[in-house]
Amino acid sequence: MISYYFQGFALGAAMILPLGPQNAFVMNQGIRRQYHLMIALLCALSDLVLISAGIFGGSALLMQSPWLLALVTWGGVAFLLWYGFGALKTAMSSNLELASAEVMKQGRWKIIATMLAVTWLNPHVYLDTFVVLGSLGGQLAMEPKRWFALGTISASFLWFFGLALLAAWLAPRLRTVKAQRIINILVGVVMWLIAFQLAREGVAHMHALFN
């Protein structure tokens, strides 16, 4: 059964490594050393719920609800555009230290709300967990399925805590004005590129719904 665990771990790691909204947010919180371990835990727990739902049967709900998928897609587009705009606005600020200080004033609940939006309004999360993991893990018998799910969940926990701790460790080097400007520009551009990609997918979904 351990082979199914490592299959799940490898697949989970492959899907979670690319830079996306979730990883960018965890990295930024780590650099700020602001609730970064709590955010890592909440991201990992969110993945636990999504992975379990996808592998143990939740994928059918998403595939049978095209309107739900369209709603999540356009909600994700709106959020990513807003999040990317905020990052670019901070990067282009004439007084980046002041802008960063304003961001640091965000309360715990606002940070948690942003994390939940970053995770749950990203349609790619549902495609990864419900479609990819659901189609692969769903074909297994119950015992191998549990080991497969445990492997993917382990990869998520290891990655988010590792990313948060590494970013916090590198914070003295990454909190310089130049580094923060580069990071915010990178995050903003990536968020807008993902939003553009989601918008194209959203248009395709809407076209399919009305034709």
From Swiss-Prot:
UniProt entry keywords in alphabetical sequence: Amino-acid transport, Cell inner membrane, Cell membrane, Membrane, Transmembrane, Transmembrane helix, Transport
Keyword Glycoprotein appears in the UniProt entry: no
Catalytic activity: L-arginine(in) = L-arginine(out)
Pfam families reported in the protein's UniProt record: LysE
Family (UniProt): Belongs to the LysE/ArgO transporter (TC 2.A.75) family.
Function, in words: Involved in the export of arginine. Important to control the intracellular level of arginine and the correct balance between arginine and lysine.
Protein name: Arginine exporter protein ArgO
